[in-house]
Design a protein with these regions (language model features):
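Catalytic-histidine neighborhood of serine endopeptidases
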Residues: 1-2, 37, 46-86, 91-94, ...
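C-terminal cap/linker of serine protease catalytic domains
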Residues: 1-22, 75, 115, 119, ...
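A conserved glycine-rich beta-strand in the N-terminal activation segment of trypsin-fold
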Residues: 12-20, 28-48, 71-74, 100, ...
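Active-site substrate-binding loop(s) of clan PA
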Residues: 20-21, 43, 76-78, 94-123, ...
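Active-site region of chymotrypsin-like
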Residues: 26-28, 87, 91-100, 125-203, ...
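Short, surface-exposed secondary-structure boundary micro-motifs
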Residues: 35, 54-56, 112, 118-119, ...
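Short, well-ordered loop/turn sites that connect or cap secondary structure elements
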Residues: 45-46, 57-59, 101, 107, ...
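Beta-strand/loop subdomains of soluble extracytoplasmic proteins
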Residues: 60-77, 94, 108-114, 123-137, ...
Length: 216
């Protein structure tokens, strides 16, 4: 028979495990200064200095990347895709703590997720939510529509480009925008992997999922 003490012990162990997972993801979280005003987030995609972020975070300015250990580097823009709002940067650093990338094809509505970023300039904040919907968004580019992840994990300016991670601490999306004040939108990790692969940096790659039916 399971008693109240057993439940409390299990809850405590689960909380400790989740906190440890989040700390590991935070080590791969960076701050990206690309626009004249403000900053966004990004993730270390590859240990050799590849940084993935949002295209709108980079803007037209020379981007700078601030690592979790407070080292800052001027970054080189190696690829960008405004339609899916992603940009790939390279910094002159090695042996970095790269993020673990999950296959967003297996993501389910209702799944627990965490959003990491620097809301309002506060570094390394974590918020929690669930996957609200797996849908598509219309674009003005050649794709016409792109898959998106909608979540109720609270986002704010400074979260853009940061990771959306699952309960295992692996990245399943890149936080991109806020809709209606209470819904976040993220680009799925498989689409991010395709973007990186098309740029010639293909260490992480997952297959495309079937298009979702819901359209926003």
């Amino acid at each position: 028979m399971i008693g109240a003490n057993d439940v409390l012990k299990f809850s405590s162990l689960l909380a400790e495990e989740m906190a440890a997972l989040v700390r590991r993801v935070q080590s791969s979280l960076v701050l990206v200064r690309g626009r004249r005003y403000g900053a966004g987030a990004g993730i270390i995609w590859d240990s050799d200095g590849l940084i993935l972020t949002n295209n709108h975070v980079v803007g037209r300015q020379t981007p700078f990347v601030l690592l979790g250990d407070d080292r800052e580097f001027e970054a080189r823009l190696v690829a960008r895709d405004p339609e899916i709002d992603l940009a790939l940067l390279q910094i002159p650093a090695q042996d970095l703590p790269a993020a673990s990338i999950a296959d967003s094809n297996h993501l389910k509505v209702g799944e627990l997720v965490f959003a990491l970023g620097h809301p309002w300039g506060q570094r390394g904040y974590v918020t929690r939510g669930v996957v609200s919907a797996l849908s598509q968004a219309q674009t003005s580019g050649k794709r016409g529509r792109i898959p998106i992840i909608r979540t109720d994990a609270p986002l704010a300016p400074g979260n853009s480009g940061g990771p959306l991670v699952n309960a295992a601490g692996a990245v399943i999306g890149i936080n991109t925008l806020i809709v209606g004040g209470d819904q976040g939108v993220a680009i799925p990790s498989y689409l991010a992997s395709e973007f990186v692969a098309s740029s010639g940096f293909a260490k992480h790659f997952v297959k495309e999922r079937e298009p979702a039916e819901a359209i926003i």
